[in-house]
């Protein structure tokens, strides 16, 4: 516990939780306090001006981060015939249909993303109770149910992240690693914010981007001055 307290004290000295920082400074501070022995993830939380209780104001989608996520992603694809071949050629680790479904039912899920061709949903739909709680259920809103499975595989490998509002109307996403440069993190954050702006529900009123904060896995969190994102 002493080490944690020491770390917390060091973070508190560097980052003022009441202050809004220009985006580059916020990311710099978060990187400086990411002192764990592993390559910490850099995460962002975005408070949106929506009513999360209303279904027409939920925000969900995906975006390919220009600088990637720094994570190696294993992809499973439900497809047959030419689409299955295209998925393999694009780099999918696991491709199948009934055999893949049986593998999942047996608890063998050594993958991070599941993609499905629309014609396989009769099989995939029956796996909802297994894939859903793990955040793996394919969904057309995030581009994981698509006839173009090859492009979906390439996007997943290139650093695509999925996002959706939680019960408090907050989006949580990873925008890179502590080893990333400030410019890479800033570019990824800008891409995410741009995607969120484009996904703004028509029913959302008032200020849409309410608060943005960046943090690392074990380090501190810093609030971002939203105006600095477009500066």
Curated annotation (Swiss-Prot):
It comes from the Bacteria. Pfam families: Ribosomal_L1. GO terms for cellular component: cytosolic large ribosomal subunit. The keyword Repressor applies. Part of the 50S ribosomal subunit. Keywords: Repressor, Ribonucleoprotein, Ribosomal protein, RNA-binding, rRNA-binding, Translation regulation, tRNA-binding. Belongs to the universal ribosomal protein uL1 family. The gene is rplA. Gene3D superfamilies: 3.30.190.20, 3.40.50.790. InterPro entries: Ribosom_uL1_bac-type (IPR005878), Ribosomal_uL1 (IPR002143), Ribosomal_uL1-like (IPR023674), Ribosomal_uL1/biogenesis (IPR028364), Ribosomal_uL1_3-a/b-sand (IPR016095), Ribosomal_uL1_CS (IPR023673). GO terms for biological process: regulation of translation; translation. Binds directly to 23S rRNA. The L1 stalk is quite mobile in the ribosome, and is involved in E site tRNA release. One of its GO terms (molecular function) is structural constituent of ribosome. This is Large ribosomal subunit protein uL1.
């Amino acid at each position: 516990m002493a080490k944690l307290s020491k770390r917390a004290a060091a973070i508190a000295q560097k980052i003022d939780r009441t202050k809004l920082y220009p985006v580059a400074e916020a990311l710099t501070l978060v990187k400086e306090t990411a002192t764990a022995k592993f390559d910490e993830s850099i995460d962002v939380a975005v408070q949106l001006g929506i009513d999360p209780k209303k279904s027409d104001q939920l925000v969900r989608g995906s975006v390919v981060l220009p600088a990637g996520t720094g994570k190696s992603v294993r992809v499973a694809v439900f497809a047959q015939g030419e689409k299955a071949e295209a998925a393999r050629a694009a780099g999918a680790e696991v491709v199948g249909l009934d055999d893949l479904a049986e593998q999942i039912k047996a608890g063998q899920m050594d993958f991070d993303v599941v993609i499905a061709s629309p014609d396989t949903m009769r099989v995939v739909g029956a796996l909802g109770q297994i894939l859903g709680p793990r955040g793996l259920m394919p969904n057309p809103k995030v581009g994981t149910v698509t006839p173009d499975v090859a492009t979906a595989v390439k996007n997943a490998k290139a650093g695509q992240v999925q996002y959706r509002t939680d019960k408090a109307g907050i989006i949580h996403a990873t925008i890179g690693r502590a080893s990333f440069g400030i410019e890479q993190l800033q570019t990824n954050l800008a891409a995410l914010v741009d995607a969120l702006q484009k996904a703004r529900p028509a029913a959302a009123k008032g200020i849409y981007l309410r608060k943005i904060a960046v943090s690392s896995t074990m380090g501190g969190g810093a609030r971002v001055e939203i105006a600095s994102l477009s500066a």
